Each structure stands twice: as C-alpha cells, then as structure tokens.
Regions:
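Domain-level recognition of nuclease-like catalytic cores that cleave nucleotide substrates
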Residues: 161, 175-185
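Acidic-basic catalytic patches of nuclease active cores, encompassing PD-(D/E)XK
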Residues: 45-109
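Conserved catalytic cores of phosphodiester-cleaving nucleases, focusing on short active-site segments
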Residues: 123-125, 136-143, 152
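Nuclease-adjacent, charged terminal/linker segments that flank catalytic cores
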Residues: 1-58
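Short, solvent-exposed loop/turn segments that connect beta-strands within catalytic domains
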Residues: 83, 129-134
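Aromatic/basic-lined ligand-recognition segments
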Residues: 106-115, 119-121
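Short acidic, S/G/P-rich loop/turn micro-motifs used as interaction or catalytic elements
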Residues: 142-148, 177-180
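Arginine/glycine-rich "motif VI" loop of SF2 helicases in the C-terminal RecA-like domain
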Residues: 158-167
Length: 185
C-alpha cells in the first residue's frame, strides 16, 4: 500500500516529489501506527503502550525496504531519459542470472584475494555500451544515518583499489530523519 500511495504522491507532485518526502513519510507513519497499534491490541491483547513499542519496531522494518523502492521510483524517469538501467544487490546474488546482469555483477565484485564480495548496493545504475554494462553508480539507501555512515565510504575505498571499479560513483541516500548530517547554510 505504501508504494501504491507513493506512486500517487509522485503523480501529484511530479519532479518536486523528492522535496516533500518527509511530508509523505510522516503521513504514512501516522497511518501505519494507528492501524498497527489497533491490530496488536485486538489480536494480541497488548496495552496501548506495548502495542506502540511493537508498532514502532514494525515500522522501522517496513520502511527500510520500502525506501529503496521509493528511491527507485524517484530516479526511474531520469534513468529512462538517459537510457540507464537499474538493478540491485539482491538480484545480483541470485543464481543463473541473465548474461547482462551477470556482467553487471562481475563489474562490481570486490576482490579480497581468496574470495570476492558484492558491495552494499541497494540500487545499481548502469549503462549498456557496445553490449557491455558500464557501472555508473552504486546507491546505498539507508532510512537512518546513525551507525551506518561508515559502510558506504568503506565500499568506495574498496572499489578504488581496482582499475576496473575505481570510477564507479558510490552514494548514500538517506532522508536523515535523525538529523545526523550537517545542514548547508
């Protein structure tokens, strides 16, 4: 339901939708809490306070995955306009990938000697050039900046160690709801 409502929200606000994300999330959080608290009180017989605590935990788990999809929706028009493709690390971890996605996977693998790992890549943007994917950017989408601020720079440093991956842009996308990032003046 959140994704469906976000698509309607994006239709309403168009290219300016990203500027109103906090407004969207606040409204969604309120709807989610009201429904979840009522559901937990009725189904599990919890007090309102106990249900509120569980509802908050449930919201955090729910919104994390939804945020990735919302960012994808926000950038899909841009990607179409510039003939870019999108995938993610969950897709790339699957077996028997189509050739194009297998090439994307191989283009971002970080070599640790005896093994290789995929960097944290909630959204991977690439362009097909002469039948081969050129990785443009890896986006790490985090609902909360706290305690995760080192993951994205770590992967960028690892990608810099190879001539093949050194030019890949690595970015973290966050609504920074905890106001952990300094604000520009």
């Amino acid at each position: 339901m959140i994704i469906k409502r976000f698509k309607q929200f994006k239709e309403k606000y168009g290219k300016e939708a990203f500027k109103k994300l906090n407004e969207f999330f606040q409204k969604e959080e309120k709807i989610f809490y009201e429904n979840k608290i009522r559901e937990l009180m009725e189904s599990q017989g919890l007090s309102e306070q106990e249900a509120a605590i569980k509802a908050r935990q449930s919201w955090v788990a729910t919104i994390g995955g939804k945020l990735e999809k919302i960012v994808e929706i926000l950038i899909e028009d841009f990607c179409k306009e510039y003939n870019l493709s999108i995938t993610n690390d969950k897709v790339l971890k699957r077996n028997n990938l189509p050739k194009e996605l297998d090439l994307v996977k191989r283009a971002i693998l970080v070599d640790f000697g005896k093994y290789s790992l995929l960097p944290d890549g909630d959204i991977i943007i690439y362009k097909k050039t002469n039948g081969l994917p050129k990785i443009i950017a890896i986006l790490s989408v985090k609902n909360s900046f706290r305690e995760r601020y080192t993951e994205t720079p770590y992967w960028k440093l690892k990608l810099l160690q190879s001539e093949i991956t050194k030019d890949i842009k690595v970015m973290m996308i966050t609504p920074d709801k905890d106001s952990q990032l300094p604000r520009p003046y």
